[in-house]
Amino acid sequence: MSYAIFRGVALAICAAPLVVACGGGNAGNPGPINSTQCSGASCGVQGPPTSGAGSGSSSGTTAGALCPATGDIVKSTYLGGAGSGEVVSLNIDAQAMTYTLKWLESPIPLHTGTVTPSRAGVQITGAVAHPPTGALPTAEQIRCAFILTPGSGTASVDGSTYSTAASFNQANPPMILVGLGVAGGGIPGATVEFDGLSIPLAGSGIGAVKNRHFDFYPFLGFASTTTDISKLPGTYNGLLYHLVPSGNYQTIATNASETFDASGNCTSSSTVPAGGSASSTGCLTTGTAWTANTSGYFDSQQAPQILPQFSKPIVGPSGKSGTAHMVLGQINGATVPLVVRTGFINLGTAPLYLDAKIDDESGIALLAKATAIASGGFDGGYVGADSNFKYTASLIQGTTGSFISPSTSQLEEPAFTLNYGLSTPGLIGVTDSNGKTGYAIASGGLYAIAIQGEENGGLTSTSANSDTPNTPYFGVGAQISK
């Protein structure tokens, strides 16, 4: 099995504290990663973890630990969302080296070649594996990284056995980096394909979805969440990333400013992307008022669309049938809403399928309170995953940010600049070295970035087709150093 990517992720994790704190450079020009150049506490975790952190023999976390004590990791079930438009719960037992993952909401077909049913409701179990000794620079990083090897479970909708073995790519597998209060990385991917419908007089291949494999889907989950709607009210900046499979996987990244009241209603005056359709109150993340789901998150019907929708022969688009789901994360004293849009398809009745509902736009959004952030206000190193289907690391230092290559631990490309002077509090302007622009937001030790350009090395070839565009770019990360 290839562990090059895990070595790269770990080096990137090391890079964040080392290059800034230990004189190895800055975010615009980081020096080579060399753990021996550091000394003292400024270098963070070094060598094997202490017994409290690594053995699981005591509860709590040791100072400098990247994740809970080994015996305590199982105590947290991470509830979150994926870029696929899925709501997922994940539990890892770091002593038994097993995991349990359940798709609570999903637009991803249960079987390749179909569009329904989805894998919503499927729970799988499998083994986790740490990268081997020596694959990561420190024992602490190895302890907190978990590869989700192929898992399986029974799909109650049709009684079939669902397995992730077919989608597992040894060179770029789903992997979770467990942190303190948060877990991120990638959940099992899938291969998506649909030949389309044959409709009399209209032809065949109607609504076809081209075959595309996804090594994993970027995921962010919280150890602590709430369904207390009183935690939500306020004005938030949001960064959204959606795609439409029936539109040849057309993607979009955009921003929104939205205000929520104590009843879960949303209002906004954000610009609606061309071809999109906001809610009746102008929102891009939220349709109807948020209502609590018994599984620990919120639902909103008639989810807005930010991409053009599939148009059926004779009758045209079928309107909004997708659903939005919000996970209210509680982390580092902040409430951080994570919203996924789950597309919906019902093929309707043959032979004309006039009653079909095809709203397959799905995606993810991170929201952050619209509170002013000064330069340096979210400095640090962040790790996560992005729209390139890569595990990533970013360095933020004042007005400069950098993407670090997982394979070389060097700059992926010239640094991007950050503009803290925008009129919207908490919304930070981003400009890359080619003049492509976008935005960044941050809250509770999490950050999201969206740029209208090709960034961070472009798409991973095993998760893209030959005509898949490398733009726009979207990434989410959790802070692991300051």
PLM regions and their residue ranges:
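Bacterial N-terminal signal peptides that target proteins for export
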Residues: 1-10
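Mature soluble binding/inhibitory domains
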Residues: 23-482
